[in-house]
């Protein structure tokens, strides 16, 4: 569909869109797991099997008290939402209800959060709401050297009950600061 192809314009598909889950990972029991922060205080992998039973039923609370590595406040009138940087949930709030969990928040520009990650999160949430099935979901921030801000995130998902027929992706979403919203090609950012 054109909506699905629009999602991929600023991302790179990894391994022909096949996630790297092990067969043993698949279950119909919902869970969520957040890796320990590394020695520099950076997030590591967030992993979940998302079902309706762990999706939130209330609006997200404040997350301003969490200062992920590399955090800075930068406000510009020309940026949609005014703030250049967002606290980006590795696993979006709408999926597991994790709010101000420092193991689930990284610094990223609004573009990566809203245009990069959110369409994939919405795809998963919509599928679960429509089918009541589960989706294996893993997001891994990728840091270069000792950088405190991730260069991007690896997002993997696969629907469980229908073996990936409903949702299946493995994409790297760039942490982009500068971009042109009218780019006609598939050049990242």
Question: What are the roles of these predicted feature ranges?
Answer:
Residues 1-5, 84-85:
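N-terminal low-hydrophobic presequence detector
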Residues 3-8, 182-186:
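Short, small-residue-biased leader/transition segments that mark boundaries at the very start
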Residues 5-23:
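N-terminal module-boundary/linker segments of secreted carbohydrate-active enzymes
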Residues 21-181:
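Domain-level detector of nuclease and nuclease-like folds
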